[in-house]
Amino acid sequence: MPVFLIGMVLLLAGAIVYVGLRAIRWLRTMFDFKRTYILWVVLVLLPLLFVFGDMLSASAFARAVTITGGVAIGVFLYILLFTAAADLIALLLRLTPISRKPAFRSRRTLRAVGCIVLALGVCVSAYGVINAATVDRTTYDVSLTGSSTDGLKIALISDLHLGSEIGSAQMRRAVDEINACKADVVIIAGDVFNADVEDCYDLDEAAAELRRIDSRLGVYAVLGNHDPAPDYPPLQAFFESAGIRLLDDEAVSFPGFTLVGRAESASMHGDGRGTR
């Protein structure tokens, strides 16, 4: 694990230096940019907000810090991707007659490319933020020979990732979509939490929203790799408050079918903190 972390830190540092040097070169095509330390501070500190937010106690402030850091990381990664793509295109163009034209190396061209890279990074990130708040519904029709489950409607949702960024507001939209399906049984297929249960800034409100799920046969869940261990007391208390039954290597039978919930293979015990 230490070797992996060191490798990730070095990779991130290299990416920051690469983007920073390209950004300085771009900014100097528009004005006399001398205070480069400001750019380096921004590039280093903004992504760290995501880590700092996770270290704070669950609150609206911690949520704002974490979301700001998360969005900053997203914008940075897309700018890194588009910058690398622009450099690759420029490298390939050097092999063509286009590279001999004065416009190829002009400040105007560099300025335009930098603006395009920045605009693409911001726009793609904005699309991701908007899309993340959208609940998509997909319908599958399944026929079972010799089964008495004709007309049975099952609603399955996964990856709620409750935590410092996602809480009751997102659960309200999800529950409204689930209830609109008028399902007979509801299944939550893992990753109910993003990490620790107590990271959720409005845990009680989120549980109250999930308790609104209306289904004839109940609401059932299994755990995913992001969830704490099944024996973690805060997790058990949350499921009880939300009216959700956890199936941890358990099965429940109904007329015509049996619902089986497998345990998460990478089980974590103890205090249940962190991911499994």
Protein language model annotation of sequence segments:
Residues 1-132:
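Non-catalytic terminal accessory segments
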Residues 132-147:
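Alpha-helical transmembrane signal-anchor/signal-peptide segments
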Residues 124, 140, 257:
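A broad, low-specificity signal marking well-ordered, structured residues that form hydrophobic/aromatic
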Residues 122-123, 128-130, 135, 153, ...:
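Preference for short coil/turn "hinge" residues that link or interrupt alpha-helices
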Residues 143-276:
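Soluble catalytic domains of enzymes that build or remodel membrane lipids, polysaccharides, and related
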Residues 63-67, 142, 176:
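Short amphipathic alpha-helical coupling elements at transmembrane boundaries
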